[in-house]
Amino acid sequence: MASKKGVRITITVECTECRTNTNKRSNGVSRYTTSKNRRNTTGRLEIKKFCPHCNAHTVHKEIK
């Protein structure tokens, strides 16, 4: 039997400033995993989170 897909899905959010910023504390790109509700949030998610590479709170956008 096939189970129904739930409404909540797991997504990955990535720092937008790590790609363009050259004055970073360390190399790399910050990524977090979180979940979102497909019915309530149909578009791409944007969250302000702490980036350890930029050493600041930056906007993290949802990636595929």
UniProtKB/Swiss-Prot annotation:
Domain of life: Bacteria
Molecular function as annotated in GO: structural constituent of ribosome
InterPro entries: Ribosomal_bL33, Ribosomal_bL33_CS, Ribosomal_bL33_sf, Ribosomal_zn-bd
GO cellular component: cytoplasm; ribonucleoprotein complex; ribosome
Pfam families per the UniProt record, alphabetical: Ribosomal_L33
Gene Ontology BP annotations: translation
SUPFAM superfamilies noted in UniProt: Zn-binding ribosomal proteins
UniProt KW keywords: Ribonucleoprotein, Ribosomal protein
Keyword Transport: no
Alphabetical list of NCBIfam families matching this protein: PRK00504.1, PRK00595.1, rpmG_bact
HAMAP family in the cross-refs: Ribosomal_bL33
Family: Belongs to the bacterial ribosomal protein bL33 family.
Protein name (record): Large ribosomal subunit protein bL33
Organism of this sequence: Picosynechococcus sp. (strain ATCC 27264 / PCC 7002 / PR-6)
Organism phylogeny: Bacteria, Bacillati, Cyanobacteriota, Cyanophyceae, Oscillatoriophycideae
